[in-house]
């Protein structure tokens, strides 16, 4: 009898460190974890690779797949659509790895309605000021985009305070401490599955 591997969802505002934590996890444990690559209609940032960081696609193509029921969640942010296909998750699970997903709170609400039984972890920035500093430090966003991301962050933080929204919350005020906490949570959850 094979053990069902439950996906792990990291959620939180843009700039809270989700991608960095996921990269650390999949680099340290490449045979244990696989990243579910989301689709997006936004343009790639410098150093992002199609098929590795995101599947960069058109609005028409992503909408067709969503309408065909091929996605477990999707959301629109700053005029761009993002989503996770069933295939992306199942491709990782088929390798025998635990699937790691990077999904916003809209997506978390959708994924809770599926049969995936995900471990939901909220990555919280130490403060909105620090989050703004991180977003500005990227140097990839317009002022308007930064303001939209900060507005979205407030909504994400509000949702995270609702009872039952997430199983765990990690404050990412120190990357190494946050990463250690993430590994401890996943280790405990995996042993209970």
What residue ranges belong to the model's regions?
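Post-Walker A helix-loop "phosphate-sensing" segment adjacent to the P-loop in P-loop NTPases
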Residues: 26-35
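Hydrophobic anchor at the beta1->P-loop junction of P-loop NTPases
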Residues: 10
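ATP-dependent small-molecule kinase phosphotransfer cores
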Residues: 38-99, 106
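Conserved phosphate-donor/acceptor-positioning beta-strand/loop module used by diverse small-molecule
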Residues: 99-104, 113-137, 171
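P-loop (Walker A) phosphate-binding loop of NTP-binding proteins
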Residues: 13
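Post-Walker A alpha-helix
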Residues: 21-23
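Small-molecule kinase domains that catalyze NTP-dependent phosphoryl transfer to phosphate-bearing small molecules
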Residues: 140-188
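Conserved lysine of the Walker
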Residues: 18
């Amino acid at each position: 009898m094979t053990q069902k591997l439950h996906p792990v969802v990291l959620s939180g505002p843009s700039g809270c460190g989700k991608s960095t934590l996921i990269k650390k996890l999949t680099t340290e444990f490449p045979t244990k974890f696989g990243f579910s690559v989301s689709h997006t209609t936004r343009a790639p940032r410098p150093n992002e690779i199609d098929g590795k960081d995101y599947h960069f696609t058109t609005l028409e193509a992503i909408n067709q797949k969503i309408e065909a029921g091929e996605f477990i969640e999707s959301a629109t942010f700053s005029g761009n659509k993002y989503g996770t296909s069933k295939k992306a998750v199942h491709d990782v699970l088929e390798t025998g790895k635990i699937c790691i997903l990077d999904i916003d709170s809209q997506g978390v609400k959708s994924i809770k309605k599926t049969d995936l039984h995900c471990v939901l972890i909220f990555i919280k920035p130490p403060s909105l000021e620090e989050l703004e500093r991180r977003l500005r430090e990227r140097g990839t966003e317009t002022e308007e985009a930064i303001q939209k991301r900060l507005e979205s962050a407030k909504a994400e933080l509000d949702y995270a305070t609702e009872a039952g929204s997430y199983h765990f919350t990690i404050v990412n005020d120190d990357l190494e401490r946050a990463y250690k906490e993430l590994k401890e949570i996943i280790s405990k959850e995996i042993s209970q599955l």
